[in-house]
From Swiss-Prot:
Gene3D superfamilies assigned: Arginyl tRNA synthetase N-terminal domain (3.30.1360.70), HUPs (3.40.50.620), Isoleucyl-tRNA Synthetase, Domain 1 (1.10.730.10)
An example Gene Ontology molecular-function term: ATP binding
Family: Belongs to the class-I aminoacyl-tRNA synthetase family.
Species annotation: Synechococcus sp. (strain CC9605)
Protein name (database record): Arginine--tRNA ligase
Length: 590
């Protein structure tokens, strides 16, 4: 079933084609939800860009499009007469009876009117990607939950999604860590969990300091890397133990956040690195510069005005991150079974890596490794800052461990809940308190991040994110709880066969907000901005609360009761589904 916006878009395109058959290209209605209620339900702005090629005034073009729309019975059955506004905007208002019918249809539809795409294609989402032998910190939070949310939306739209965790499990750091552990904690290289991950992180710091300060240690560490790369069984066993230990600790965080990932670390691509060099050589892109193999970028210059290089093989013959990323791109777009067969590859990393990926993407494009019509995208995000506007740190100045941050969020949510229960003189079981605090705490952390435009930095504040008012997870969760309370008070939210009738302005406002859901999901799929979904859910919660506060529901007249209960149910279903796509669980009681 086509959604309202899809039906309108198709009707507008057909009308534009009939009105201007000579303009066979560029006929895009530019359909969007109306910015204000007085403009109707949708606005079509496609007349404006046609003015120049057609050499006509935009209002004249809009008039011709409207004439064709009015001659289409399917359109007149869906919409009232269009209005032309401003320089040539076409304002469209859906007929009230069609809006009511759409609400009825969504009540019986688990997808709530969001159609699966007709052109589903495999997508790779690369996110989280912590480093072995290091604990996950607050910087991993954004990549992990943004990537998870985008994967959920793409999956919901019908795309097969491969969620990849490109962990840092290879490189010089293992040479220095293994060398150091052989001397100070050899048991860690022979026995699983001989030291915990926190100790391993401390050992890593010690090894890094020795590597920076001691040339002999540097040399021994590099020899260890060579042994590891050469398949030395002792080195490989030590490496495997370190990876397994980190992997188990990472999984505890992923389980807690309800994150699904398939690990495919940097080491996976080692066998494919020589082929990257061969492929670039065959494409005549390689240039030797100071003994290193490089590809010089087009249109990107350094301060000296010369093209910047992407180094793919160092002068000592070693490979680097760029080589691994190029091998990963080749594999991800490569045809199965030798590759993933993806048509869209999305990298979710901090904005500091934007230049790196821009360079790697350009090299892959010029080498011919991105299939025609495929999409390769970097999804950058800003820093998590403290309330002082600086990078979030502990009081001791260290990076905040992710598990500590999650623990504190849940503890604060529990403190708030116990305080509220005391004020309300409510008695709840310990199981209830722990469940609600855990759900609210993690929801607050996720939503506070996802509700920000990911491109910008944001200031982390437990007080703000746990507030029951404002654009917060608790506010949205409370809207769901409010509706669940209607059912507990005797409202039958399960009935779907009632003839829906709406008369109050608050009802129509809620209807119109509910019917925007499909367009918002399509927008998030295309633009990869989860905050658009957050903004919509917040606005929906506000519109619902105004409706619920101003219009009687359980005490409504019998002829209005079923319709108002239907609105409550669809609101709850939309909030649950929308929050679920953000990776946030809901509650029936708080």
């Amino acid at each position: 079933m086509l959604s309202l916006s899809q039906s309108l878009d198709a009707q507008l395109r057909a009308a534009m084609q009939r009105a201007f058959p000579e303009a066979d290209a560029g006929l895009d209605p530019q359909l969007a939800s109306a910015s204000k209620q007085e403009f109707g339900d949708f606005q079509a702005n496609g007349a404006l860009p046609l003015a120049k090629p057609l050499k006509q005034a935009p209002r004249q073009i809009a008039t011709a499009i409207v004439e064709q729309l009015q001659a289409d019975p399917a359109f007149t059955d869906l919409c009232l007469e269009p209005q032309i506004a401003g320089p040539g905007f076409i304002n469209l208002t859906i007929r009230p009876e069609r809006l009511a019918a759409e609400v009825s249809a969504r009540l019986g539809d688990e997808r709530l009117g969001v159609p699966a795409v007709s052109n589903a294609a495999p997508v790779v989402v690369d996110f989280s990607s912590p480093n072995i032998a290091k604990e996950m910190h607050v910087g991993h939070l954004r990549s992990t939950i943004i990537g998870d949310s985008l994967a959920r939306v793409l999956e919901f739209r019908g795309h097969p999604v491969l969620r990849l965790n490109h962990v840092g499990d290879w490189g010089t750091q293992f040479g220095m860590l293994i060398t150091h552990l052989k001397q100070v904690a050899p048991e860690a290289l022979d026995t699983a969990d001989a030291v915990d991950l926190g100790d391993l992180v401390a050992f890593y710091r010690e090894a890094k300091k020795r590597f920076d300060d001691d040339e002999a240690f540097q040399s021994t560490s590099r020899d260890e890397v060579v042994k590891l790369q050469g398949g030395d069984p002792v080195s490989l066993k030590a490496w495997g133990l370190l990876c397994d230990q980190s992997r188990r600790e990472f999984q505890k965080i992923y389980d807690r956040l309800d994150i699904l990932l398939s690990e495919r670390g940097e080491s996976f691509y080692n066998p494919f690195l020589p082929a990257v060099i061969d492929g670039l050589k065959a494409a005549e892109l390689l240039v030797t510069d100071d003994g290193a193999q490089c590809v010089f970028l087009e249109g990107v210059q350094g301060k000296d005005g010369k093209p910047l290089p992407v180094i793919v093989q160092k002068s000592d013959g070693g490979f680097n991150y760029a080589t691994t990323d190029l091998a990963a791109i080749r594999y991800r777009f490569g045809a199965a079974p030798e590759g993933d067969g993806a048509r869209r590859v999305v990298y979710v990393t901090d904005a500091g890596q934007a230049n790196h990926f821009a360079g790697v993407f350009q090299v892959a494009e010029r080498a011919g490794w991105i299939p025609d019509g495929a999409r390769l995208e970097h999804v950058p995000f800003g820093l998590v800052q403290g309330e002082d506007g600086k990078k979030l740190k502990t009081r001791a100045g260290d990076t905040v461990r992710l598990r500590d941050l999650l623990d504190e969020a849940v503890e604060r949510a529990e403190t708030d809940l116990r305080s509220r229960l005391k004020e309300e003189e409510r008695s709840e079981s310990e199981e209830f308190i722990q469940h609600v605090a855990g759900t609210v705490g993690l929801a607050a952390v996720k939503y506070a991040d996802l509700s920000q435009n990911r491109i910008t930095n944001y200031q982390f504040s437990f007080d703000r994110m746990l507030a029951l008012q404002g654009n917060t997870a608790p506010y949205l969760l409370y809207a769901v709880v409010r509706i669940a309370g209607i059912a507990r008070k005797g409202g039958d939210l399960a009935a779907t066969n009632a003839q829906l009738q709406f008369s109050e302005p608050q009802e129509w406002a809620l209807v119109r907000e509910l019917l925007k859901f499909d367009a918002v999901i399509a927008e998030v799929e295309e633009e990869l901005l989860p905050n658009r979904l957050c903004s919509y859910l917040f606005e929906l919660s506000q519109v619902f609360n105004r409706f619920y506060d101003q219009v009687p529901v359980l005490k409504a007249d019998p002829e209005a009761l079923a319709s108002r209960l239907a609105l409550c149910r669809l609101t709850a279903d939309t909030l649950r589904l929308g929050l679920g796509l953000l990776g946030i669980a809901t509650l029936d009681r708080m």
